[in-house]
Amino acid sequence: MEITFFGTGAALPTKERNTQAIALNLDPYSNSIWLFDAGEGTQHQILHHSIKLGKINHIFITHMHGDHIYGLPGLLTSRSFQGGENKPLTIVGPRGIKNYVETTLQASLSRLNYPVTFIEIDDQLHYHHEGFTVSAYNLNHGVPSFGYRIEAPTTSGKIDVASLREIGMEPGPKYQEVKNSDSFIFNDKVYQSSDFKGEEKVGPKIAIFGDTMPCENELKLADNADLLVHEATYIDGDRSLADSHHHSHINDVLHLLEATNSKQALLNHISNRYNLSDIDVIYAELQNQYPNLKFKFVRDFDTFEI
């Protein structure tokens, strides 16, 4: 799996950062791409990447602030002409996302040539698709704002070809039965499939947060995650400014990373008060403060394997 950041700034687009948009490539589990938020200019950012709009089959919106949704109407209409025709799309988000999309399309006299399903969240959500589990919990941002926990499916262990050949089974269609069942019959004898394949591989767990100040539901979302994607709007000074705007201070995020035993954090939604050189200096200081934690401030178009 890969995660790509098409927008890493907060509130307003700048020359260095676009507003929020994150793409999650589900390969090798699925041929799909999921998009998290679609700030202004998202479709233009995607033009600079190999991702095609037609492959996006889910869009998850964290909350209804403009820097997270202003790019959605244009992206939806462009999808009609960029490989999305007749390909269903599911949009998940806070209550109001359906009205926002339908109103903007109606006002601009736009029509989509593919079906759209809306799932609106009031408090929490547990959603299953193609073996993935998505859990959403309300955060604390002054408006309904959600974080999403994505759990990839567990995959079967690799077939032990040498062991199967020892019992006389050569590679062929029968191997799929060994891979996908608990037991199989070969030459009138019953075998346990687990004796002929490696251990199951648990899929990665990813938590993608909307804007928030610290709250209890963050712990549920981040628990033992392989990756946290979290806002870092305020990365220096005291936390009073972060609190007054219902955002997190960088120390809150790193404490969350540590408390939940998560493996690493990618930090985005960075205020335009910080330029790139400011961030480099602050990052070096934070690495000295938290030497045992793995974290990184991301930039537009950064891609990471999960």
Swiss-Prot record:
Q: List the top taxonomic levels of the source.
A: Bacteria, Bacillati, Bacillota, Bacilli, Bacillales
* Family annotation (NCBIfam families): PRK00055.1-3 (NF000801), RNase_Z (TIGR02651)
Q: Which reaction does it catalyse?
A: Endonucleolytic cleavage of RNA, removing extra 3' nucleotides from tRNA precursor, generating 3' termini of tRNAs. A 3'-hydroxy group is left at the tRNA terminus and a 5'-phosphoryl group is left at the trailer molecule
Keywords of the record, alphabetical order, are: Endonuclease, Hydrolase, Metal-binding, Nuclease, tRNA processing, Zinc
Q: Please state what the protein is called.
A: Ribonuclease Z
Q: List the disulfide bonds.
A: none
Q: Cross-referenced InterPro entries, in alphabetical order?
A: Metallo-B-lactamas (IPR001279), RibonucZ/Hydroxyglut_hydro (IPR036866), RNase_Z/BN (IPR013471)
Name the active site residues: 67 (proton acceptor)
Name the PANTHER family on file.
Answer: ZINC PHOSPHODIESTERASE ELAC PROTEIN 1
The UniProt entry, under SUPFAM superfamilies, shows:
Metallo-hydrolase/oxidoreductase
EC nos: 3.1.26.11
Q: How and how many cofactors are bound, per the record note?
A: Binds 2 Zn(2+) ions.
Family of this protein = Belongs to the RNase Z family.
Which cofactor names does the annotation list?
Zn(2+)
What interactions and quaternary structure are annotated?
Homodimer.
Give binding positions for Zn(2+) 1.
Answer: 63, 65, 141, 211
Q: What positions does the entry give for Zn(2+) 2 binding?
A: 67-68, 211, 269
Q: GO MF annotations for this entry?
A: 3'-tRNA processing endoribonuclease activity; zinc ion binding
What the entry lists under HAMAP family is as follows: RNase_Z_BN (MF_01818)
Give the protein's biological function.
Zinc phosphodiesterase, which displays some tRNA 3'-processing endonuclease activity. Probably involved in tRNA maturation, by removing a 3'-trailer from precursor tRNA.
